[in-house]
Amino acid sequence: MNRKCCGPGYATPLDAYKNGPREKLLYVVTVQPNLSESHGDYLSTVDVDPDSATYCQIIHRTFTNRTGDELHHSGWNACSSCFNITGDDATKIPKRDKLILPSLNSNNIYVFDVGTNERKPEIWKVIDGKILLDNNVSSPHSTHCLANGNVMISTMGDRNDNAKGDFILFDSQFECVGTWTKGAEKAKCGYDFWYQPKFNVMVASEWGAPKNFKQGFHPDHLANPDEIGRRLNFYKWNEQTLFQTIDLGDEGMTPLEVRFLHDPTECHGYVGCALYSNLYHFWRKEGSDRFEVEKVVDVPAKKVDGWALPEVTGLMGDIIISLDDKYLYFTSWLQGDVRQYDITDRSKPKLTGQVFLGGVVLSDSNVVVTEDKELKKQPDPVFVKGKRLQGGPQMMQLSLDGKRLYITSSLYSPWDKQFYPDMIKSGGHMVCLDVDTENGGMTLNADFFVDFSNEPYGPTVPHEMRYPGGDCTSDIWLDE
């Protein structure tokens, strides 16, 4: 007799929102910008329990002991998509005990064991980047677990670092299964992805050709539409085929972080287009299998003197949606602010909060704003616990209850070196915003600051964050 067992995660998004525990640890992808430092990138374990004696401290570092990786994003071997398991053998219930960290530059994929000792993760397996090249993919990015036990990772290039959007699959023991996409139709570029089995759909976004973005930001890389992201790609989930591509145009260049709503019965989502800081809403009309898009937020560029370019765009780095699907947040890495929007009306986000955390247009910088459609004066530098915030807000992670928003400062180390050399010298940071979930609004927590300036082998820069039990960007729920 078959029965349903409870796997990892939570039954529903609202179950996680209402009943999930307060986070006590954060796993933070940490990049060593000094490429000659032999310990390389690492996974930081950060204590975020306010009752702990080591609150706001990095309590463990798990080094790759390799150079040239550029760890970037991370994902789990199992999540809430595996919550409902049918069967009699409880030993076969998936466990959320492995954290996967792909490397953008080397193509190596690190699998960390976080189940044996969640405070001291260890590297369990290293998947050699040559395996990806053998499958004609490179620059692995986003990781999601699948309900069948496999793990899927998006890729952005072919074996020669030309633009190519695809996905590579691994089984539960992290043996390569091959690429996911079937048929001759492939996306021009790749980056992030999110799936919704109820609607038989997966959406994927685009950055650009690895051979280009690895060099840093260069405006001439925007000229070839086949080498720069500007499209949303929709796949039939069961058939594993690309069936619709929507070109967002110049305003939609570099659509990066893409999210469906957490509620698996709502076929709505958003994508943050980094270059010109535009937020797009996408949805499928009832009775149709085709998706539509609309631009719902447009952050205006600031005209400036004293900078490398005549305008400073926001550079929308990350977007995140609260588990109750009420609020959407995004960061503007160059303009330096974090924004909160009420998305109860999916087509008309309402700005409900804004906090500045650095950026390139600060009042004491050499950059002079000559035209600003939003602000009357340039924002002042921000200090937390006596330390000036270098760089700008980039990656985010939201607590399950939506009340704490954690933010790191690094985008991608070649770009960090280009836009924020002082952050490379002094190290990055992590801060926290306290969120009003009832009325909207955010305030900087003056007591929370994680400093990456005095690390054992020199200053480092933090990027993506995860909680041990799952979070607002790792878990996908099924309608069961």
Spans of model-derived segments:
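Beta-propeller domains
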Residues: 2-6, 15-95, 100-128, 162-163, 183-347, ...
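Structural signature of eukaryotic scaffold interfaces centered on beta-propeller domains
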Residues: 2-22, 70-95, 136-148, 194-200, ...
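Short, conserved, GDST-rich strand-edge loop motifs in beta-rich repeat architectures
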Residues: 15-21, 28-38, 84-102, 153-163, ...
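Short loop/turn segments immediately following beta-strands, especially the blade-tip
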Residues: 45-54, 111-121, 173-174, 234-241, ...
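Surface-exposed loop and turn segments in beta-propeller and other repeat-based domains
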Residues: 57-78, 124-136, 180-188, 242-252, ...
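Asp-box/WD-like beta-propeller blade repeats and closely related beta-sheet repeat scaffolds
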Residues: 114-197
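Loop/turn-rich, solvent-exposed surfaces of beta-rich toroidal or solenoidal domains
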Residues: 266-285, 309-423
